[in-house]
Amino acid sequence: MIDKFRTLSGQVISNKMQKSAIVSIKRLIKHPLYKKFVKKTTKLCIHDENNQCSFGDIVEIRECRPISKTKSWMLVRISKKSLRS
């Protein structure tokens, strides 16, 4: 069976909410006219059931059903823990 959920990885920029975190996704887009690569950033609110991610962690997230008005992504795993404690 083909997995129908998209998966992305990004950095946690806020975890001050209960069971939620905000993840920043960075990507490069080629400008259509000038052909220069431009950095784009997307902030996504994710569901973190066990409050296990902390500020600065690199996490892997996947798309899921809408959990609230802003949350439709959930934490899959923490790829790299931040050095901050």
UniProtKB/Swiss-Prot annotation:
GO terms for molecular function: rRNA binding; structural constituent of ribosome. HAMAP family: Ribosomal_uS17_B. Belongs to the universal ribosomal protein uS17 family. Gene3D superfamilies: Nucleic acid-binding proteins. InterPro entries: NA-bd_OB-fold, Ribosomal_uS17, Ribosomal_uS17_bact/chlr, Ribosomal_uS17_CS. GO terms for biological process: translation. PANTHER family: 40S RIBOSOMAL PROTEIN S11 FAMILY MEMBER (PTHR10744), SMALL RIBOSOMAL SUBUNIT PROTEIN US17M (PTHR10744:SF1). One of the primary rRNA binding proteins, it binds specifically to the 5'-end of 16S ribosomal RNA. The keyword Plastid does not apply. The keyword ATP-binding does not apply. One of its GO terms (cellular component) is cytosolic small ribosomal subunit. Pfam families: Ribosomal_S17. PROSITE patterns: RIBOSOMAL_S17 (PS00056). Transmembrane segments: none annotated. It comes from the Bacteria. Part of the 30S ribosomal subunit. Keywords: Ribonucleoprotein, Ribosomal protein, RNA-binding, rRNA-binding. This is Small ribosomal subunit protein uS17.
